UniProtKB/Swiss-Prot annotation:
Note: The basic functional RuBisCO is composed of a large chain homodimer in a 'head-to-tail' conformation. In form I RuBisCO this homodimer is arranged in a barrel-like tetramer with the small subunits forming a tetrameric 'cap' on each end of the 'barrel'.
Mod. after translation: The disulfide bond which can form in the large chain dimeric partners within the hexadecamer appears to be associated with oxidative stress and protein turnover.
Localization: Plastid, Chloroplast
Residues where N6-carboxylysine is found: 194
Protein name: Ribulose bisphosphate carboxylase large chain
The entry's keywords: Calvin cycle, Carbon dioxide fixation, Chloroplast, Disulfide bond, Lyase, Magnesium, Metal-binding, Methylation, Monooxygenase, Oxidoreductase, Photorespiration, Photosynthesis, Plastid
Cofactor remark: Binds 1 Mg(2+) ion per subunit.
Residues involved in Mg(2+) binding: 194, 196-197
E.C. number(s) listed in UniProt: 4.1.1.39
Organism (species): Abies firma (Momi fir)
């Protein structure tokens, strides 16, 4: 009988994939997973299982393992730390060698790191809390089409947050009435108006008609105000070809910005669109529809900061990032954590803000965070203070819900933001005097 090469059967992952002595390399992609194992599964085994299944491992030793260098290609669980206040949870840190990932592909990055392990039997729940993207990998991405500085230069708007408004009712308006609402908001003083994320091309309003009427509204408002205006024309579609067709038509109309739903549209489509936008001078607004399906559970899924980093690599000039206002204090620090990850070049590790790794983006352009959803003019002082100048504040109902109509609603928001910025620049405390500032401005 043939001599036995190795023993068949199920093998403990930790023998190969748990390596506490490992020194991480500057080129490694690092991940922090919140792991909740099944009862009886030791932390080292669960952490190693995650490292194995998201890199080179399978449940047994295979002959072809001998044809490669596992040491060079395997993911490694290099550290495990308990989670305060949680008996059965811990953070597993995993290092992945750079060569496991295709250059310039967020799609491949996610397929590898979160593609398979989340259904793993030995785990009750698994959440990816953060990723460290090394410059060696981030440099293979184009990133945002233009970034914050280029956008300000294109729009000629400096020293204040930009203002937007989602056109409501989001479904049911005809293209002409929709265009009229766009015109009224832009004419009143907003910088942008927005297609809702689910406005694509429905029977009551086909995309081409909407694009034409919105372009007319933009041109009219620009001519009357002397300011550069935009409307986020949603190019999201059922196929990549159709999406590109819409983006190309937007460029032909001469509008400054288009929009995409990056999670429902997918990273591959989003990256293609981002490349087109840079090549053709279009800004790209990104909506995060479907994010809560992935990021809402505290112990399973992915934190939004990971989706935000992925978007910065895939490409977008704006991305929705929550509002903070009216929520808990802790939420504020965590939100500002990923807002910094979107805007800044270098972000220090800071666990109090949920940032598990120091992230160096080198020279990748930044993304403007968009605060949107249930905010109105009385939130303006808080929003100005929390988000600072490099942000887009979007008031849908907070503009169109004004008792006097759309244009007065837009005027109210513009007056409020300028009053808040001026008060802040004069050294007034917006947290304390915010309401007073708004009252004075409204006279």
């Amino acid at each position: 009988k043939a001599s036995v090469g190795f023993k068949a059967g199920v093998k403990d992952y930790r023998l190969t994939y748990y390596t506490p002595e490992y020194q991480t390399k500057d080129t490694d992609i690092l991940a922090a997973f919140r792991v909740t194992p099944q009862p009886g599964v030791p932390p080292e085994e669960a952490g190693a299982a995650v490292a194995a299944e998201s890199s080179t491992g399978t449940w047994t030793t295979v002959w072809t393992d001998g044809l490669t260098s596992l040491d060079r290609y395997k993911g490694r669980c290099y550290d495990i730390e308990p989670v305060a206040g949680e008996e059965s949870q811990f953070i597993a840190y995993v290092a992945y060698p750079l060569d496991l990932f295709e250059e310039g592909s967020v799609t491949n990055l996610f397929t590898s790191i979160v593609g398979n392990v989340f259904g793993f039997k030995a785990l009750r729940a698994l959440r990816l809390e953060d990723l460290r993207i090394p410059p060696a990998y981030s440099k293979t991405f184009q990133g945002p089409p233009h970034g914050i500085q280029v956008e300000r230069d294109k729009l000629n708007k400096y020293g204040r947050p930009l203002l937007g408004c989602t056109i409501k009712p989001k479904l049911g308006l005809s293209a002409k009435n929709y265009g009229r609402a766009v015109y009224e908001c832009l004419r009143g003083g907003l910088d942008f108006t927005k297609d809702d994320e689910n406005v694509n091309s429905q029977p009551f309003m086909r995309w081409r008609d909407r694009f034409v009427f919105c372009a007319e509204a933009i041109n009219k408002a620009q001519a009357e105000t002397g300011e550069i205006k935009g409307h986020y024309l949603n190019a999201t579609a059922g196929t990549c070809e159709e999406m590109m067709k819409r983006a190309i038509f937007a460029r032909e109309l001469g509008v400054p910005i288009v929009m995409h739903d990056y999670l429902t549209g997918g990273f591959t489509a989003n990256t293609s669109l981002a490349h087109y936008c840079r090549d053709n001078g279009l800004l790209l607004h990104i909506h995060r529809a479907m994010h809560a399906v992935i990021d809402r559970q505290r112990n399973h899924g992915m934190h939004f900061r990971v989706l935000a980093k992925a978007l910065r690599m895939s490409g977008g000039d704006h991305v929705h990032a929550g509002t903070v206002v009216g929520k808990l204090e802790g939420e504020r620090d965590v939100t500002l954590g990923f807002v910094d990850l979107l805007r800044d070049d270098f972000i220090e590790k800071d666990r109090s803000r949920g940032i598990y790794f120091t992230q160096d983006w080198v020279s990748m352009p930044g993304v403007l965070p968009v605060a949107s959803g249930g905010i109105h003019v009385w939130h303006m002082p808080a929003l100005t203070e929390i988000f600072g100048d490099d942000s887009v504040l979007q008031f849908g109902g907070g503009t169109l819900g004004h008792p006097w109509g759309n244009a007065p609603g837009a005027v109210a928001n513009r007056v409020a933001v300028e009053a808040c910025v001026q008060a802040r620049n004069e050294g007034r405390d917006l947290a304390r005097e915010g309401n007073e500032v708004i009252r004075e401005a409204s006279k």
